[in-house]
Amino acid sequence: MKSYLVGGAVRDALLGLPVKDKDWVVVGATPAEMLALGYQQVGKDFPVFLHPQTHEEYALARTERKSGQGYTGFTCYAAPDVTLEQDLQRRDLTINAIAQDDSGEFIDPYHGRDDLKARLLRHVSPAFNEDPLRVLRVARFAARYAHLGFRIAPETLSLMREMAENGELEHLTAERVWKETESALTTRNPQIYFLMLHECGALKVLFPEVDKLFGVPAPAKWHPEIDTGIHTLMTLAMAAMLSPAVDVRFAALCHDLGKGLTPPHLWPRHHGHGPAGVRLVAQVCERLRVPNDIRDLAKLVAEFHDLIHTFPILKPRTIVGLFDSIDAWRKPQRVEQIAITSEADVRGRTGFEAKDYPQARLLREAWEVARAVSPKEVVEAGFTGPAIREELTKRRIRAVAAWKEERCPQPAAEG
């Protein structure tokens, strides 16, 4: 019986990155022997145990054989005669198939260390194509390690393309797709995840509303990058620079879905694409069972991002109405979230990456002015029932109007 450190802990240590969780594989042991040593069994589908002191996971060496469709269609074989090399062979990427023994020596039968040096994400064996979830995992690793220069090996990308074409991805559950996507959205370069899915054809299967944006032109004057799919990824990249929050990043991804509905004879203009895209956002979120708070923000950003771009010329009544529409009084964080996504939209364009976005500052300022109007004072002034809300709205509009007169004087008529 011998234990080896495997997977992410070995990989990240070799990359000089912080090691979070340690996973171990045990060769030459039975479940009874593990239990006798005080390990606690937690795995249902295959034997996984928690160490009695460290509570780190120890899995018995195993092989997997395809026995059905999708990522759950596997039969596992765990027994003392399964070798370390056999266990490593079932893993997805060579960089995840490196083991280390207690003396510090590496066992690397699939040359994962060479691929780490070459910054390559390469599949271990042709059995890679038996698990469709691996397409998303590899795209996520590409996003996670993009800042280190990693790229997907051409032969692995080709295999991912075959998997997308043969219908295997359709067996993935909504929960698994969202879990991988949510994890990818937390990386430093989440746009790479969606770019890789687009390149291998998986985006068309899993996110057709986003995939449809590629090849849709926008006016070159406002969008030198022209392609709306490219703009979407640039906006997501900018949102990731401005905020670590998944809801903000997902909203950036979905902000222009409505442009995919524009009839080609109207290109490159997309009048009304924001409100038109709201139902597409809802469609994506329903299909993938996206959490409600993330869904709701994405719908609001789709509907109102273009309005924010015109903030300096908005009427005070429109500004207060915007705060009503986004339910800012109960969910004040939405003001900041929408400010960030609107800024990401403007700066997510070729040549505009460093552009100042005063609209975000004005939005924040106007919000502070409007929220400073006291509901308590309205009640104390004798207003009751629906009249409270009416008077509160009037006072907020007056306050915003006074602020706006000072901050954004308009010589011409407002729009």
From Swiss-Prot:
Record key words, sorted: ATP-binding, Hydrolase, Magnesium, Metal-binding, Multifunctional enzyme, Nickel, Nucleotide-binding, Nucleotidyltransferase, RNA repair, RNA-binding, Transferase, tRNA processing
Give the Enzyme Commission number.
2.7.7.72, 3.1.3.-, 3.1.4.-
Q: Where is the HD domain?
A: 228-329
- UniProt GO BP: RNA repair; tRNA 3'-terminal CCA addition
The free-text cofactor remark is: Magnesium is required for nucleotidyltransferase activity.
Q: Which InterPro entries match?
A: CCA_bact, HD/PDEase_dom, HD_domain, NT_sf, PolA_pol_head_dom, PolyA_RNA-bd, tRNA_CCA-adding_enzyme
| Short name of one Pfam family | HD
So which domain of life are we looking at? Bacteria
Instruction: Give the molecular function GO annotations.
Output: ATP binding; CCA tRNA nucleotidyltransferase activity; cyclic-nucleotide phosphodiesterase activity; magnesium ion binding; phosphatase activity; tRNA binding
Q: What is catalysed by this protein?
A: a tRNA precursor + 2 CTP + ATP = a tRNA with a 3' CCA end + 3 diphosphate; a tRNA with a 3' CCA end + 2 CTP + ATP = a tRNA with a 3' CCACCA end + 3 diphosphate
Which SUPFAM superfamilies is this protein grouped with? Nucleotidyltransferase, Poly A polymerase C-terminal region-like
* Residues the entry annotates as binding ATP: 8, 11, 91, 137, 140
Positions annotated to bind CTP: 8, 11, 91, 137, 140
User: Magnesium among the record's keywords?
Assistant: yes
Determine if Glycoprotein is one of this entry's keywords: no
The entry marks the following residues as binding Mg(2+), namely 21, 23
Q: Which cofactor does it need?
A: Mg(2+); Ni(2+)
Q: Which HAMAP family match?
A: CCA_bact_type1, CCA_bact_type2
Function statement: Catalyzes the addition and repair of the essential 3'-terminal CCA sequence in tRNAs without using a nucleic acid template. Adds these three nucleotides in the order of C, C, and A to the tRNA nucleotide-73, using CTP and ATP as substrates and producing inorganic pyrophosphate. tRNA 3'-terminal CCA addition is required both for tRNA processing and repair. Also involved in tRNA surveillance by mediating tandem CCA addition to generate a CCACCA at the 3' terminus of unstable tRNAs. While stable tRNAs receive only 3'-terminal CCA, unstable tRNAs are marked with CCACCA and rapidly degraded.
Q: What else is known?
A: A single active site specifically recognizes both ATP and CTP and is responsible for their addition.
Provide the assembly information.
Monomer. Can also form homodimers and oligomers.
Description of its domains: Comprises two domains: an N-terminal domain containing the nucleotidyltransferase activity and a C-terminal HD domain associated with both phosphodiesterase and phosphatase activities.
Q: PANTHER family under this entry? A: MULTIFUNCTIONAL CCA PROTEIN
Q: Which family does it belong to?
A: Belongs to the tRNA nucleotidyltransferase/poly(A) polymerase family. Bacterial CCA-adding enzyme type 1 subfamily.
From the Swiss-Prot or TrEMBL record, give the protein name: Multifunctional CCA protein
Q: Lineage in the entry?
A: Bacteria, Pseudomonadati, Pseudomonadota, Gammaproteobacteria, Enterobacterales
Its gene is cca
